[in-house]
Amino acid sequence: MGSIKVTVLGAGSWGTALSNLLAQKGVNTVLWGRDSAVIEEINRERENKRYLPGVKISQELIATADLEFALKDANFLVAAVPSQAFRDLLQKIKPYFKPEQILVNTAKGIEEGSLLRMSAVFTEVLPEYRDNYTILSGPSHAEEVGRGIPTAIVVSGYSPEKLYKVQELFSTEYFRVYTNDDLTGVELGGSLKNIIAIASGICTGLGLGDNTRAALVTRGLIEITRLGIKLGAKKETFMGLSGLGDLFVTAGSRHSRNYKAGILIGEGKSLEETQKEINMVVEGIRTTRAAYQLAQRLEVEMPITEALYKVLFAGLPPREGLFGLMTRAKKEELNF
C-alpha cells in the first residue's frame, strides 16, 4: 500500500497507535503533532513515552510538527484529537483539504455550545465535502492496539464507497473493521458511553459492588439508546461494537480515563483535582454537560446523565446522586 499516503493529525495515544499500525502495514504514514518535544522523541527514540509508553514505533513512521508538510499529497486524513478540539483542527486543515481526500475522525464527543456531533461540525466547516467524512469507533484502547492485541471496531459515514476504503486501509490480522451505515447511532454510542463510564467509576470509588455497577451500566445503555432513537438512530446499533462494545470496555477498564476519573471523584477528589491527576483529556466530563443540555432540549429522560451532571457541575455529593437513582418512580425495564 506504499502508493497511499495517510496523515494522522494528533500525536496522543490513539493517534500514535493508529499511525504505528498503518506504518507497520506498509502504508506511507505521517504523524503530525503540535508538541515538538513529543515529535522529536518519536523520531529519535521510536517511542511516545508521554502518551503511549512501552510501544515500539515503526522505523517507517515519519513524525512532524509541520502541518503543511504533513498534509501534502495525503489520501486519508485521520483526526485523532479530542472532540472539543475537532473544529479548530478542521479550520487549520481547511485551506489544504482536497476533494478526493477522506477524513477519518476518531473523536468521541458532542461539541459544547452547539451540541453538535462531529459529523455536523465537519459539515459546518467543510460543507462541500460532507460525504468525505467517516468515523472510526468501538472498543479500542490505544494501549492494546499498540501491542497488537486483537481488536474489532466500526467505520461509519455517508458514502458506502468511502467506508469500504477506510475498512480496507485499517484492517490487519489483529485489527478488524466492520462497516455500519448508522452514523448517528455510531457517533452517539461512542460519545455517550463516556458519561456512563465516569458514573461506573464513581461506584467503584464509593466502594460499591458489582451489582451496583452492573445495574448502572445496563440502565446507562437504555438511556443512551433512548436519546439515539429520538435523534433518528437505529436501536440495534447500540447493541453493537460502537454501543455495547465501547460501553463494556470503557466502563470498567484500567485503561479508561473516564472510568479512572470516576473512581477519583467517588473517592472524594474534586473535578479539578481529578483532571490534574489524570493529566489527559477526559472526554466524558464535557460530554456530560453537552448531553444533559441536549436531553433537556429534546425532553429525553436520562437520569444517570442528569445525576452525573449535578455531581460534576452543581455540587451534588456522589453518594447522594447515586442513591437518588434508586428511589426514582417505579417503571417497566425496557422503556425506550
Curated annotation (Swiss-Prot):
Keywords noted in UniProt? Cytoplasm, Lipid biosynthesis, Lipid metabolism, NAD, NADP, Nucleotide-binding, Oxidoreductase, Phospholipid biosynthesis, Phospholipid metabolism
The reply on keyword Acetylation is: no
Q: Does the keyword Lipid metabolism apply?
A: yes
Pathway the protein acts in: Membrane lipid metabolism; glycerophospholipid metabolism
Name the InterPro entries for this protein: 6-PGluconate_DH-like_C_sf, 6PGD_dom2, G3P_DH_NAD-dep, G3P_DH_NAD-dep_C, G3P_DH_NAD-dep_N, NAD(P)-bd_dom_sf
Q: Give the UniProt entry's GO cellular component terms.
A: cytosol
Q: Where is the active site?
A: K193
What would be an example GO MF term here? glycerol-3-phosphate dehydrogenase [NAD(P)+] activity
What is the first-listed, main subcellular location in coarse terms? cytoplasm
Annotated positions binding sn-glycerol 3-phosphate:
K108, G138, S140, K193, D246, S256, R257, N258
Any idea which positions bind NADPH? Answer: S13, W14, R34, K108, A142, R257, V281, E283
Give the EC number. Answer: 1.1.1.94
Q: Which domain of life is it from?
A: Bacteria
Localization per record:
Cytoplasm
Catalytic activity of the protein: sn-glycerol 3-phosphate + NAD(+) = dihydroxyacetone phosphate + NADH + H(+); sn-glycerol 3-phosphate + NADP(+) = dihydroxyacetone phosphate + NADPH + H(+)
**Gene Ontology biological-process annotations:** carbohydrate metabolic process; glycerol-3-phosphate biosynthetic process; glycerol-3-phosphate catabolic process; glycerophospholipid metabolic process; phospholipid biosynthetic process
| NCBIfam families, per the entry | PRK00094.1-2, PRK00094.1-3, PRK00094.1-4
Family annotation (PANTHER family): GLYCEROL-3-PHOSPHATE DEHYDROGENASE, GLYCEROL-3-PHOSPHATE DEHYDROGENASE [NAD(+)] 2, CHLOROPLASTIC
Q: What family classification does the UniProt entry report for this protein?
A: Belongs to the NAD-dependent glycerol-3-phosphate dehydrogenase family.
Q: Which HAMAP family match?
A: NAD_Glyc3P_dehydrog (MF_00394)
Q: What does this protein do?
A: Catalyzes the reduction of the glycolytic intermediate dihydroxyacetone phosphate (DHAP) to sn-glycerol 3-phosphate (G3P), the key precursor for phospholipid synthesis.
Q: What is this protein called?
A: Glycerol-3-phosphate dehydrogenase [NAD(P)+]
- Which species? Carboxydothermus hydrogenoformans (strain ATCC BAA-161 / DSM 6008 / Z-2901)
Q: Highest lineage ranks of the organism? A: Bacteria, Bacillati, Bacillota, Clostridia, Thermoanaerobacterales
